């Protein structure tokens, strides 16, 4: 009979990234890997239950010895990772560029065109800003959990541990499907982008070239992979900076065609699309899911937790910096797009598919400016962007498979890691699914990917809601078990209230998506086809949840707060020493300039 993951005893026997110690793979890895065998739950409590932040409990003081300090400094990496076999070579810049690689792609360069045509320039800015505020709470929640529990797969584990196994299985499987579909989708997008220069060569030939390149990149060790993604992401960041400067110049009338543009297109054809307030509001609501999808991948910082050098410091830094970088990029670019491209421009809908760079508002903006040569350069950048996203998709998908295999949601052979720290079985399975990209030459490829994307269309929203709910439940358990927040290496800036805000707003986005999917914009009534294209992932989520319940025969709705394991996988912390460190840090920071304090808080 399988052990119950709702009980503390289950997590007490979990090591190596929360892999059951009884699994056959664990015994094999024992011979080739050095790992900690003393788990916090098998020794004395890792954290003193008394604290000034825990009312009603007597304060106790632990003696701090030189050996304590030595262990704290020298064994950080070993304790941080809880000895997963994955290579631990990713730094802050690697984590940041991995997230950028996953989040800045067709969502920004291409899909924003359809969103502009559907909702108008005001809808673009409003929706992306609202989603950004939710994302800020998600990033903070994720930073707190990942710093405390830097395990392989990150949030894939948190929802199972802090919410409920069936819920975790459904959300994780949906999230995994998103990355599985994204790989072939981006490869097809790359082949379509090539048609801008040459449409005579068979698309599958280009798919084969890109497929082989991505497969090779993911066969490298994780550090080499991180450096590859760093270069690709830097190209995207530089292109965004370049377009921002160019967009400002064009908007002010500095292009070859001359003439001040400013907010001209906000007045004609208008800030919103539609002739009535109801139609305009529906257009606004229909863009929300596009906004959320475009940000998907920013949670990659937590997926990489088990492969970073010092996750308790790097994860919060990378998460916050990633948020500001991606949010600033999107909001700035979208504002400029709204000024340079009218929402009724027919080219926004002329693409052969949702990933056709011909409908990119950035390319259209440059063409409208009359600058020769630059549209071709922007197309080349879009090509690099989609290849980068496909590269990140293999990484994210394989690590999610490892995490799900660790917690028993996928077959155990997927969690095996080779001597170079690569989860080869998971990578090969992901690449196998990528063979779907060879439908690029088919006339039905757009229809195929429309329905494949529908399988996980809302997965990003489900994932973010699960992260915020995990954080809420974690904090509730801390309170019930009378634990101190001083135990946490990083504390969310938005707190529990911020997590509730993000969860509620994302829930409202799901409701808005239900409405716009069932009653699509421009339709005469309810449309079953439109509904399943936009909302199919929700009934699939329910089926996965119920199916897991029936299979496991576990009818508990939530992990009990008093039973929640708050120790396993965390480093032993001396609260007295930690408080002294925090006091010194605050005093040192208080002497710094305002700019330094500002950057320290937000970045």
Curated annotation (Swiss-Prot):
> Which residues lie in coiled coils?
none
Q: Where in the cell is it found?
A: Membrane
What InterPro entries would the database entry show?
Answer: AA-permease/SLC12A_dom, Amino_acid_permease_CS, Amino_acid_permease_fungi, APC_YAT
Provide GO CC annotations from the record.
cell periphery; endoplasmic reticulum; membrane; plasma membrane
Topological domain (Extracellular) residues are: 117-121, 186-203, 256-279, 343-376, 443-451, 511-530
Q: Where is the composition biased (Basic and acidic residues)?
A: 66-75
Entry's family note: Belongs to the amino acid-polyamine-organocation (APC) superfamily. YAT (TC 2.A.3.10) family.
For this entry, the protein name equals Histidine permease
Q: What is the lineage of its organism?
A: Eukaryota, Fungi, Dikarya, Ascomycota, Saccharomycotina
